[in-house]
Design a protein with these regions (language model features):
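Conserved catalytic-core segments centered on acid/base and nucleophilic motifs
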Residues: 1, 8-9, 151-155, 164
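Phosphate-binding site of ATP-dependent enzymes
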Residues: 1-103
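Acidic-enriched, low-complexity/disordered segments with a strong bias for Aspartate over Glutamate
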Residues: 14-15, 21, 65, 73, ...
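A short glycine-rich, hydrophobically flanked beta-strand micro-motif that places a catalytic Asp/Glu
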Residues: 49-53, 65-66, 141-158
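Generic beta-strand hydrophobic packing signal
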Residues: 81-83, 149, 166
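Flexible domain-boundary/linker segments
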Residues: 85, 100, 145, 149, ...
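C-terminal active-site "lid" helix and adjoining low-complexity regulatory extension at the edge
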Residues: 108-146, 155-203
Length: 203
């Protein structure tokens, strides 16, 4: 759900279960019966996806995920415009702006948290970019008119790629009113759509 709303994490403990909601509130439940009761309270009249957690953490245990910006430029072809790493506050199960500790440059974070060399980092980013472009091309074949997108993804502890969602209306302009670390990507993503628009118009 948008902004991480509705995300709930359940962990098995030696003495029961630990349930953490998207607000960071924790519930220690002693039995499956208590767990079911708590889930019924939180899961209200909606269809949910249940999945095993994919571990993606900094070296100090903060949850991380990534956003890559893929845009069409004056060549009218998809290209990588920027990549950033969203690092959650300690204990949070989501990394949206309300529960975020900071944003780091994507290349730096991939190298640092996954112990990759410069060459390995470049190769990984190329892999991620190519996968995302293929997804966007598939969406275009389904009838979507696209020129600008952000794709959220995570890397597990072995740097395997898992896509989370494609954002086609991510409102980049709101970053101008946020912290400096979030504004860092703006020079790379704000101008490219204008290049594409000019190409479409024949300029």
């Amino acid at each position: 759900m948008a902004g991480g709303n509705g995300i709930i994490q359940a962990k098995k403990l030696d003495d029961g279960f630990l349930l953490t909601d998207y607000n960071g509130e924790c519930f220690h439940l002693k039995s499956v019966k208590e767990l079911k009761k708590a889930l019924k309270k939180h899961l209200v009249n909606r269809t949910y996806i249940i999945q095993q957690e994919i571990e993606s953490f900094t070296n100090t245990g903060e949850k991380i995920d990534f956003r890559i910006y893929i845009q069409k430029d004056y060549t009218m072809k998809w290209k990588l415009s920027g990549i950033e790493t969203k690092i959650a506050k300690s204990g949070s199960v989501v990394s949206n702006s309300k529960y975020r500790a900071r944003i780091e440059p994507g290349e730096l974070a991939i190298s640092k948290y996954y112990n990759l060399s410069k060459e390995e980092t470049e190769k990984k980013i190329n892999e991620i970019t190519n996968v995302c472009i293929q997804v966007l091309k598939r969406m275009e074949k389904q009838g979507y008119l696209l020129g600008d997108a952000a794709v959220d993804f995570i890397l597990d502890k072995s740097a395997n790629l898992y896509l989370l969602e494609v954002q086609i209306d991510y409102a980049a302009e709101i970053k101008a009113f946020r912290e400096e670390d979030e504004q860092r990507v703006l020079p790379y993503i704000l101008t490219t759509p204008f290049e594409y628009a000019k190409a479409l118009a024949g300029f």
